[in-house]
Design a protein with these regions (language model features):
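Glycine-rich N-terminal segment of FAD-binding domains in flavoprotein oxidoreductases
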Residues: 1-52, 69, 87
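FAD-binding subdomain of flavoenzyme oxidoreductases
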Residues: 54-61, 65-207
Length: 209
């Protein structure tokens, strides 16, 4: 069966019922996974998060945005276009941000902006028994309490279903230039990348083709 929740409370109610009936639940985002994490191989309930795809709040001055998990990376950046800000993690596919957090997505921009782990400030999640928790902090500088947010990031739905995320934003660069370089060996290419990063040049992406 497929369930289409629209709020955190609905996710909580679904998980409470499934927990009581010992029914498996698999979260379903944008189905962009190449590894099949969204497949309900043991049956049960497929929890389709596509109807939870809203931007809940935007704080451009503090460079952060709070969203529901079903919004995709491209849709989020379209919403942010007028602000001059963007969400930096780019795994290639147009994944949902909830799925990106659940799988600790990375991508070609990680060399400059980091992975999903570094770009989630706080989150809300529903545990298997329906309990709703909040983890992390909206503040950039915080050392209070257990770091449960980073425990949930990359847990692939095994610890809970992410229902809300507060994400870091970055300014869109004024200019972007791309170049292709040839090297006599892979070792030479790697050494060039190391020296480039050590020199402090703000590289957004570095790929080996």
């Amino acid at each position: 069966a497929v369930a289409y929740p629209e709020t955190t409370e609905e996710v909580s109610q679904i998980l409470k019922i499934c927990h009581a009936q010992e029914c498996p639940v698999v979260a379903y985002g944008a189905a962009s996974s190449l590894e099949g994490q969204h497949l309900a191989v043991a049956g049960g309930i497929s929890l389709d998060m596509s109807r939870m795809a809203r931007v809940l709040s935007l704080d451009a001055e503090d460079l952060k945005v709070t969203v529901q998990p079903g919004i995709t990376r491209k849709s989020l950046n379209e919403e942010l276009r007028a602000t001059g800000l963007f969400f930096s993690v780019d795994p290639g596919a147009d994944a949902s941000v909830g799925g990106m957090a659940a799988t600790r997505a990375s991508g070609t921009t990680a060399v400059r902006y980091g992975t999903m782990r570094e770009n989630v400030l706080a989150l809300e999640a529903v545990m298997a028994d329906g309990t709703i928790i909040r983890a992390g902090s909206d503040a950039r500088k915080s050392s209070t309490g257990y770091d449960l947010a980073h425990l949930l990031i990359g847990s692939e739905g095994t610890l809970g279903i992410i229902t809300e995320l507060t994400l870091k934003l970055h300014g869109v660069p004024e200019t972007i230039a791309a170049a292709t370089c040839r090297f006599p060996s892979v070792e030479d290419a790697v050494n060039c990348v190391i020296l480039t990063i050590q020199s402090g040049i703000p590289m957004a992406r570095i790929e080996l083709v």
